[in-house]
Amino acid sequence: IDKLASQSVLFNNAHSNVPVCSPSRASFMTGVHPLSSGIWGFGNALKQETFINSKSIPEYMRENGYMVFQSGKVFHSNPKNVWDDKGVPADYGPVAYNGKKAIGHPSNPAEMAKELGPLDATFVPLSDVPKIDSSSSGPGYEGWRFSNWQTNRHFNYVSESERDLLTDEMSAEWFEKKIDWIKQNQNNNQPFFIATGFIRPHTPLVVPKKYYDKFPLNKIKITEKLKDDLIDTKFRENLKETRGHKAWRLLSQGYGSEEKGLKIFTQAYLASINFADEMVGRVLDALDKSSYAKNTIVILFSDHGYLLGQKDHLWKYNLWEETTRVPLIIRQPNNDNNAGKTVAHPVSLIDIFPTISDYCSLKGNTLKSEKGKNPNGFSLKPFVEKPELETWDGPEEALTVVASWKSKLPEKQHLAIRTDRYRYIK
């Protein structure tokens, strides 16, 4: 990713519009802000009127003559017949299994799995193969298991050289083959759009041991916590324990101290990032070795950030900086003069759709019916071509929302505004 950034323009103040997976993806794939669509929680977007009546990026590109392909984790609510090829299904695993269902890994605190579920409570090397004894909750099971109901099979692991591939490895391999396939089957130079969604560092943080070995526990630097960091939040006085605070408490209790627990979790998180970084490298290598490198726009970003102990939290879906801020890198061919430059202006993920539309000169209505909404974002192309730009057509701030759960009215949700200097949380 550092290599890509050195060839690209890096947005240092880019933010998710809703910092949790499903609604974030519904938002950036349509360009419609959550406050406009009403999608800021965990419901199925395919049952939401605005979403199903607004065109997504692949739908709009397909109408404009593009072949559209995806693999891995791109949509949570994937509309039918959108892609020409859907590639590898998103599977978060492998996970421990008791013969009936996924459970927490025995090397991690049992109470975390009980309270948070097996995904968020699993962070071990792939070589730590679970062996679950029989109990009243299941007949027992030895080995890993894929987590997706569509996959629903044993994950084979004998050694690092003799095992099944993780979903992200399969997606990287799929991309390498897809580029070759396009070269062999492309008709009349038909343009293409490929969305490759890597799952890590989403939990479970299970990757090959070699990535863990790069980050020895005795060299891990954990989050430096501010004194009295919760004073400004009113959590203790007014709110029930959040999931993020619960995860932090259970991690600390499970390992006997905040420092030990956070070191172990941070090691797993860094290992997963390093693993994902290598998968990104495989995709870029395949593209750069092809004849398409010089006329393909590359956009790399994440759906949200993550708190690692800040504000006594270990999760996403809140309005603090570390959770809303995301990596955003755009590589434009023949833009060498701006390679490695950064943009400090606040932008957000709803700007992805208009940016792609601008670069690809897409035309036509972005609505399926009058019940849909047009993209709320703005093209980032002016920043890519002039990173020092001080003004643009878009807003001067990035707007993020988190559900209040007490009302469906947009004005009743929790909001954060990020400017070039400040963050205001309501």
Enumerate the language-model features and the residues they cover.
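Formylglycine-dependent sulfatase
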Residues: 1-426
